[in-house]
């Protein structure tokens, strides 16, 4: 039950990024949605207790956030990139020391993993509070 609530929170914050955010927020939302989809659809394959798709998604997400943080001047991108790197470090530590208990591994990944969409949502909200216009809508509007 808690797991579903956390997934709902992450998806809701991703939707906030898409709806209220600018270009970097929307790119981050797209990257997070792609990482969620990869983790869910291909999450069953394991090597040494690690889910290969989850590790791959987290490494790609960290790389994407590092790229966004170096490209755009937004405070939340640095915070999200740092937390994404912490998630990757969690994967590396479990790979190097397989005796780490599974619940400790999940807890080690959970807090930084939840901080990523939270930071993105706060960044989009801050942009909205500042009165900045969002880029073009989801669908093109008719010229009538």
Regions found by a protein language model. Give the residues of each.
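Hydrophobic alpha-helical membrane segments
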Residues: 60-64, 80-95
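Core segments of alpha-helical transmembrane spans in multipass integral membrane proteins
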Residues: 29-43, 52-66, 82
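Membrane-interface helix caps and helix-loop-helix hairpins in membrane proteins
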Residues: 43-52, 71-74, 99-104
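C-terminal membrane-adjacent module
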Residues: 88-144
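Structural signature of hydrophobic alpha-helical transmembrane segments
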Residues: 1-8, 48-59, 107-113
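Membrane-interface helix-boundary motifs at transmembrane edges
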Residues: 16-29, 70-74, 129-135
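N-terminal signal-anchor transmembrane alpha-helix
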Residues: 1-44
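Hydrophobic cores of alpha-helical transmembrane segments in multi-pass inner/ER membrane proteins
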Residues: 7-13, 60-70, 114-126
